C-alpha cells in the first residue's frame, strides 16, 4: 500500500495538471471500488475548478470551487495517472491496463487524470471542504509526522506506558498519521531500536529521538519519489527510487550496512507484517 512519501509524490505530480484548472468532463466507469462512489459523482465533478491539492496522511484531497473536496485513497494498487498533455520532461504516459480505468477527469488544458486500480481497494468520495477533517477516514488520524504538532514531547507522551511493540505504536494511525511498514522499519534501524521492544520501555530521549529520524526518512523518500515495490508509480508513470537505498527493508540475510557491524539483517513477523532489523544494532 502506498505510504506517505508515495502519496505526497503523487500529489505533487498531479498539481501541474489539476491545480487551478477546470474539470471539463468527469467519467465514472463503475459504481464502486472499495465502497460505492457518491451519487452522481461524475455530474458533480464536471465543471468544478480544482482550487488546490493537499494531502492528509495517505489521502489526497482536491478542494473544488463548489465547496466540496474530492477525497482520494489509492488503496493497495491504485494509481493516479496523467496523460494527454506533455507536462514535464519525465512524462511517461499511461502504462497501466485501461480496463482498470475507473474514474477519468478531462482537465482544462488537455490533461487527462485517470484513477486506475486493478485490485479495487482504492476509494473516492466527495465531502464538504469545511468538514473534511470530520470524514470517517480522517477523523481518527493523529498529527502529520512532518507537521509542527508532531514533536518529541508529543511522541514521548503517547508512548509512555504503552505495552505494545514500538513498531505497532508507530504504525498506529491514531498516534501519527501516514507511516507504514517500510518506513517504520527504516526509522527503527536508524534509531537502533528493536521492532519488538515495548513502546513504554523507551526512555524519553529515545522517544524524542524518533521524531527527527521519522522526518529524515520521509523527506529522503519524498525526494526519491517514493518506493516502487509492486504497483506504485508516480503520476507521470515514473518509478520511485527510495527502494534502492533501503538499509533493512527487504534485505533479509544480507549483511548489516552499519560500518563495523558483523550482523545479518533478520526478519520477524509482527501482526502479519514482516519486520526487518539487525539483531546486533537494534536493541
Curated annotation (Swiss-Prot):
Listed CDD domains: EcFpg-like_N
Active-site residues, record numbering mapped to chain: 2-3, 58, 273
Pfam families linked to this entry: Fapy_DNA_glyco, H2TH
SUPFAM superfamilies in the record: Glucocorticoid receptor-like (DNA-binding domain), N-terminal domain of MutM-like DNA repair proteins, S13-like H2TH domain
PROSITE patterns recorded: FPG_CAT (PS51068), ZF_FPG_2 (PS51066)
Enzyme Commission designation: 3.2.2.23, 4.2.99.18
UniProt GO BP: base-excision repair
FPG-type Zn finger ranges: 247-283
Keyword Nucleotidyltransferase tagged: no
One of the record's GO molecular function terms: 8-oxo-7,8-dihydroguanine DNA N-glycosylase activity
Purpose: Involved in base excision repair of DNA damaged by oxidation or by mutagenic agents. Acts as a DNA glycosylase that recognizes and removes damaged bases. Has a preference for oxidized purines, such as 7,8-dihydro-8-oxoguanine (8-oxoG). Has AP (apurinic/apyrimidinic) lyase activity and introduces nicks in the DNA strand. Cleaves the DNA backbone by beta-delta elimination to generate a single-strand break at the site of the removed base with both 3'- and 5'-phosphates.
Family in the record: Belongs to the FPG family.
Protein's name according to its UniProt entry: Formamidopyrimidine-DNA glycosylase
Organism: Cereibacter sphaeroides (strain ATCC 17029 / ATH 2.4.9)
Gene that this polypeptide is encoded by: mutM
Amino acid at each position: 500500500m502506498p505510504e506517505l512519501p508515495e502519496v505526497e509524490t503523487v500529489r505533487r505530480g498531479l498539481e501541474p495538471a489539476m491545480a487551478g484548472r477546470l474539470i471539463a468532463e468527469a467519467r465514472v466507469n463503475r459504481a464502486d471500488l472499495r465502497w460505492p462512489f457518491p451519487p452522481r459523482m461524475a455530474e458533480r465533478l464536471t465543471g468544478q475548478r480544482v482550487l488546490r491539492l493537499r494531502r492528509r496522511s495517505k489521502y489526497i484531497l482536491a478542494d473544488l470551487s463548489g465547496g466540496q473536496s474530492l477525497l482520494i485513497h489509492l488503496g493497495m494498487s491504485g494509481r493516479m495517472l496523467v496523460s494527454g498533455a506533455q507536462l514535464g520532461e519525465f512524462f511517461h504516459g499511461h502504462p497501466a491496463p485501461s480496463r482498470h480505468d475507473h474514474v477519468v477527469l478531462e482537465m482544462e488544458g488537455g490533461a487527462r487524470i485517470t484513477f486506475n486500480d486493478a485490485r479495487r481497494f482504492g476509494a473516492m468520495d466527495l465531502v464538504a471542504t469545511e468538514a473534511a477533517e470530520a470524514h470517517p477516514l480522517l477523523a481518527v488520524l493523529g498529527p502529520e509526522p512532518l507537521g509542527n504538532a508532531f514533536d518529541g514531547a508529543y511522541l514521548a507522551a503517547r508512548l509512555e506506558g504503552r505495552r505494545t511493540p514500538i513498531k505497532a505504536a508507530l504504525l498506529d494511525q491514531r498516534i501519527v498519521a501516514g507511516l507504514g511498514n517500510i518506513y517504520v522499519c527504516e526509522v527503527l534501524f536508524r534509531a537502533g531500536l528493536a521492532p519488538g521492544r515495548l513502546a513504554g520501555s523507551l526512555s524519553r530521549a529515545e522517544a524524542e529521538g524518533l521524531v527527527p529520524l521519522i522526518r529524515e526518512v520521509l523527506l529522503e523518500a519524498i525526494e526519491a519519489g517514493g518506493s516502487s515495490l509492486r504497483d506504485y508509480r508516480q503520476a507521470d508513470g515514473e518509478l520511485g527510487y527510495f527502494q534502492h537505498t533501503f538499509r533493512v527493508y527487504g534485505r533479509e540475510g544480507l549483511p548489516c550496512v552499519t560500518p563495523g557491524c558483523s550482523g545479518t539483517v533478520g526478519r520477524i513477523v509482527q501482526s502479519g507484517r514482516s519486520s526487518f532489523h539487525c539483531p546486533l544494532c537494534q536493541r
